Regions:
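Beta-rich nucleic-acid/ligand-interaction surfaces
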Residues: 121-132
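Conserved small/polar residues in nucleotide/adenosyl-binding loops
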Residues: 144-150
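Histidine-centered catalytic/metal-coordination loop motif
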Residues: 1-122, 137-142
Length: 154
C-alpha cells in the first residue's frame, strides 16, 4: 500500500474557527483567520515538497498518523526538560489535539486526497521536543487491513 510521510516545521498550530462579521450593508460573511490560512499553506508546501505529488484515489480509505512535537520553554529547568524529552511529561496545553488534526486534514483536501472523509483511521500524539514540528504519515489501507474493535458491534 502507498504511504506518504512529511514534516511541518515549527510549533503545532490548531485550526481556528471561522470568524463571522457584519458588512457595512448589514449582511454577514465568514472568513478564515490569517494565521490559520498561513499554517495551512505551510502544510501544503511541505506536502508538495516531500510527497512526489502523490494523490490518493477518490474513495481510497486512509490511515493518518500525526505526531505533534511542542517546543520546550527556555525557562524550563534542566530536570523538567529532561523529563519532557524522555516522555515522562506530556504537553497538556493548547492547541488541542483535535484542532491540530483538523488543520492538517483540511489543508490536504484536494491535494493529497479528494476529501478528509476518506480518513478512516486517525492516530495522534503530543510530545515535547527541542525541535518543534509536526510529523504526518498518510497510508492507503485496504479493507482487509483495517482492524475492528474486539467488542461486538450492535
Amino acid at each position: 500500500m502507498e504511504t506518504v510521510r512529511f514534516t511541518v516545521p515549527g510549533a503545532p498550530k490548531g485550526k481556528a474557527r471561522a470568524r463571522t462579521v457584519r458588512s457595512k450593508k448589514g449582511g454577514t460573511f465568514s472568513y478564515t483567520p490569517e494565521g490559520t490560512m498561513l499554517y495551512e499553506n505551510l502544510i501544503k508546501c511541505c506536502y508538495r515538497q516531500e510527497s512526489n505529488n502523490i494523490i490518493f484515489n477518490d474513495g481510497q480509505p486512509l490511515k493518518v498518523t500525526i505526531i505533534a512535537y511542542y517546543p520546550i520553554v527556555k525557562s524550563t529547568s534542566k530536570k523538567k526538560k529532561q523529563q519532557m524529552l524522555e516522555d515522562l511529561m506530556f504537553p497538556t496545553k493548547k492547541p488541542d489535539i483535535d484542532n491540530i488534526a483538523k488543520s492538517i486534514l483540511d489543508a490536504l483536501n484536494k491535494l493529497a486526497y479528494r476529501d478528509d472523509t476518506q480518513v478512516v483511521t486517525l492516530h495522534m500524539e503530543k510530545h515535547y521536543a527541542e525541535d518543534p514540528r509536526v510529523e504526518v504519515e498518510i497510508e492507503a489501507v485496504s479493507y482487509t487491513h483495517l482492524t475492528l474493535p474486539t467488542t461486538e458491534r450492535v
